[in-house]
Amino acid sequence: MQFAKAHGLSCRQDEMGNVLIKAPATPGYEKEPGLILQGHLDMVGDKTADCPLDLEKDAIHPVVDGGYVCAEGTTLGGDDGIAVAYALAVLDAKDIPHPALEVVLTVCEEVGLLGASAMDFLTLRAGFW
């Protein structure tokens, strides 16, 4: 929500915690069908038995190993974070032309698609997912 507000974008959060951010089309793309970018905000963390991290409270400390970003003793936890990062990067970029965007960020995906199930998709207007 803070990201959207800082970028002057329309946003709302539903009772479940899902977030919808809307961005207008860039010049020249106003008549193109809108596009939905979607990702989920939750993740499942896993760790080795000897890893001291409390995955509910502690930060994961990434390391670069052989050119790959990894985490010691735990999963990196990227999961669908890449979809969220991609969507926010597109919204932030000044050099990526696009039609009107609706960024849908859902919660509780890992425990049964609860966020997506609670979302009112009839409010979305984009032509493509």
Regions found by a protein language model. Give the residues of each.
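A non-catalytic alpha/beta surface segment that caps or lines the substrate-entry region
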Residues: M1-P33
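Active-site metal-coordination/substrate-binding segment of hydrolases
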Residues: Y29-A100, L105, E110, S117-D120, ...
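A generic local structural motif
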Residues: H7, K22-P24, V90, G115-M119
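Short amphipathic alpha-helical surface micro-motifs
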Residues: Q2-K5, G17-L20, V84-A87, E110-L114
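Phosphate/diphosphate-binding glycine-rich loops and adjacent basic-rich segments that engage nucleotide
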Residues: W129
